[in-house]
Amino acid sequence: MREVSDPLDLIKEWTVRDDDVEFVSGSHERRRLGLLLLLKFFEIHARFPSNLEEVPDGVVDFVARQAALDAMSLESYEWDGRTIKRDRAQVRDFLGFRECTVAEADLLVEWLVGNVAASERSFDRVKAALVGRCRSERIELPASGRLDRMVRSALSQAEDAAIATVARLVPDNVAERLHALVDDDIDDSSGELSTLGWLKSTPGNVSLETMLVEIDKLRRVREIGLPAGVLDSVPSALLVEWRRTVGVESPSHLRRRTAESRVALLGTLLQARERELTDTLVDLFIATVHRINARADRKVTKELVEAFKRVTGKENLLFAIATAAVDAPDEPVRDVIFPAVKGGEVTLRELVYEFKSKGPVYAQTVRATLRASYTNHYRRGLIELLDVLEFDSNNSMHRPVIDALELVKTFKDSRVRFFPDDAEVPVHRGIVGNWASLVFNNDLPERRVVRTVYEICTFQALREQLRCKEVWVHGADRWRNPDDDLPADFDERRVEHYTALRQPLDATEFIDTLKAEMDAALSALNDDIAGCDWIDIADRGKQGPIKLSPLDAVTEPSSLRALKADVGRRWGTIPMIDMLKEAVLRSGCLDQITSTASRDGISPDTLVERLLLVIYAYGTNTGIAAIAGGEHGHSDNDLRYVRRRYLTNDIAQAIAVEIANATFAARDPEVWGAGSSVVASDSTHFRAFDQNIFTEWHARYGGRGVLIYWHVERKSMAIHSQLISCSASEVAAMIEGAIRHSTDMAVEGNYVDSHGQTEIGFGITRLLGFDLLPRIKRINHVKLYRPGPKRPGDYSNIADAMSRPIQWGQIAEQYDQMIRYATAIRTGTASTEAILRRFMRSNAQHPTYQAMIETGRAQKTVFVARYLRDRQLQRSVNDGLHVVESWNRGNSVFFYGKGGDIASNRRDEQELSVLCLRILQTSLVYINTLLIQDTLADDRWSRRLTDADRRGLTPLFWSHVAPYGEVRLNMARRLDIT
């Protein structure tokens, strides 16, 4: 028998009512308890138990006591035969249910097909919908096997119906071109990709060649001519499934499908690839324009540095030159000036180089070099880009750049130096300022516009406006119309969205609350600062007004070292594969797996073993080929097949989430304390292959690679991971993980370092309803804003750190729009990074940006005022970040293969490696949690740990784990854990 986990559930589900007793009173005394159990079980599950083993422990006695029946009478109850059939019929009649006939089963499947199975593709959720439908229709649930067959039938029929609809909408000539995509496979002799493989391939590194290849791909996709809207009727969940399926199938696999299925899958691929390629080209454009500028800057700097030697004593030098010139004004320079200077001509040349290396001459030289680089190399790709991308803007202020692009396209093949006099040249902010002297030629009688320089300035202006999404691209996804990022139903569901964010509908109420918090925090700091010997606020000029003493170092308690040693003695050295196996078997996380293919010829036990090995191969970065040689009986091809068909990134994410949830459920509060609602997040750098547009140079880490952004809670369990580029916003990554981690944890606060906080970040997190708790590196320069106008005597003890009042009027005016953006992040209508692009400094004049900044400044003031006077908060932030830093140290221990480099240029492969590493480390934390609890249950440890020991207790250690060596997977060998 299973157990009832919660006593409240026992009371809620198995309480006997008076009418229940009356219902069984007419039956023979020996049948009453069995009949009553059938009744209560059916009320809970809408089906009957097949035997007594399905009834939870403790239920029989609980029910018998309530009904004043003898529990022993159940021993004579027959669970098979005419009696129980009669009892079941009685229960159905009493509750108003009926058996599920063949006709009703067909109707249920038909209902699933029309209402659920197309938009929801999860087997478990479709099954739950079927169970709910049976209850509402008062139909007894079919047997488990029959129920599963009904669900599978509904999923299949819904997909077939969608496929048929798409196939009807695709013209015959387009269908022929789609079929032609799978006519060829990889050429084994040359190794060249098939046409389909080429279209699915990822872009190379940022270069002109990559840009031209991606342009060719986009043109090839568009040449097929898939009609617009042909897939609009297909639910997004089914499109995601089709996209995943066609992504892993080769041309030969697709050829074995029906023609209709092939058209639907390939059409889905082309629609998705058109958006992806458009996004990629925008990324390449932004990176290329930046590269042109950066390389010109480096080239000029290198040339000048090589010739540069700083000249000292310039005042004396100037005096000597002036004296010589005045004394002999008519003599040649070489005869008068050179001899007057120590070092002669050489010194004067060095002075010229020094002047050129800074100021306007240097900038002018950089711009000239940039022009040459653009004209001689990059122009070809950037101009061709204009033929395949359509730019647009919703803001009339930025229309001149769009008009300028049309002018550039008009003269793209022209060789003239200047635009013709009759050409209408749009004036935009990219051609004014420092570039004006190069854009406009003033040597001619009439001022003329230099065409190539104008193109450069236009592309630079376009880049800046794309980055903040003031200019957007038709047919893109990440770079689409920013209005599409916002929830379309916001106006109709405004109250619901405000309630979900726990924000008031009235802007005045929001402002009054925030203003009161500011005043309370500032007043508390002002009143308490005299007693806080760790903080001093005074005017220190450039050093900043705030002086905060560092926290005292805390050493690891000796008892914790002894505890870890005891764990090692009791269980010995545990191979990492066994830690993973134990976590998977105990958590049941592989129950979440659904295949990306339709056929399943692998037994569940074999599938579990192969998945464990693939996860281990990716998580350790050793690779499948290395793991295939271990003691487990699975070949390289077997493992690669399972990887391709079963282990998607979504499934790996679900596995990690299930292990985290299992850890939370297994924790003993007496050991670990109450659950926390605060996480810490930080990034760490991984070197990675760089023949892709995602890998970037990171100045702080000094190498090319990617960043992994982790969210880890106080007891060392990672709840979220993200693979981001080195230039990505860590604030966006922080918000994304805090609200979309999918675990059972409710996040109410987030510790970050300086890279994870900005004033925009403070504003967004305030609206989203959780606290941003940063460790600010340059806290000495932080300014505290006033909640209202300055008055004599206000905050006099902290006056040197005070700044201007918050502009509450801007917040009130843009409050609803800010809530709209926060709702977009909460509901996921667009990625957090896409939303936050609207709040970049280059878009500082946007009114919503200004309002968000003011909100962030107010919230940051509240936090900093609390932080400065609360030593415990400082330590909590520091301890939380120490946990995520310890997690980062573990990365190098377990991700040891190939020198720790992510050895793939494919984004999905890189993400899977990170997810599998997360699975390994969450498995370690899960099993260590159980090992520690078992160890502390020993009488020797019952009173040994102090409060300080318990605060420092962590399951993130690996002194007893063997991450290296031959992989020996034995599913029968289990760890002896309670």
Where are these regions (language model features)?
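Short, charged amphipathic recognition helices of the HTH superfamily
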Residues: 34-35, 56-57, 619-630, 636
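Glycine- and acidic
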Residues: 20, 565, 597, 604-613, ...
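Flexible, glycine/threonine-enriched loop-and-boundary segments that flank and lead into catalytic domains
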Residues: 685-696
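Catalytic or ion-translocation cores adjacent to nucleophile or general acid/base/metal-coordination motifs
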Residues: 73, 77, 629-667, 671, ...
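Long, compositionally biased intrinsically disordered regions
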Residues: 800-978
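Structured, charged N-terminal subsegments at the starts of enzyme catalytic cores
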Residues: 520-630
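Long amphipathic alpha-helical coiled-coil/heptad-repeat bundle
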Residues: 2-518
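Short, conserved catalytic/metal-binding motifs centered on acidic residues
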Residues: 46, 624-627, 679-685, 734, ...
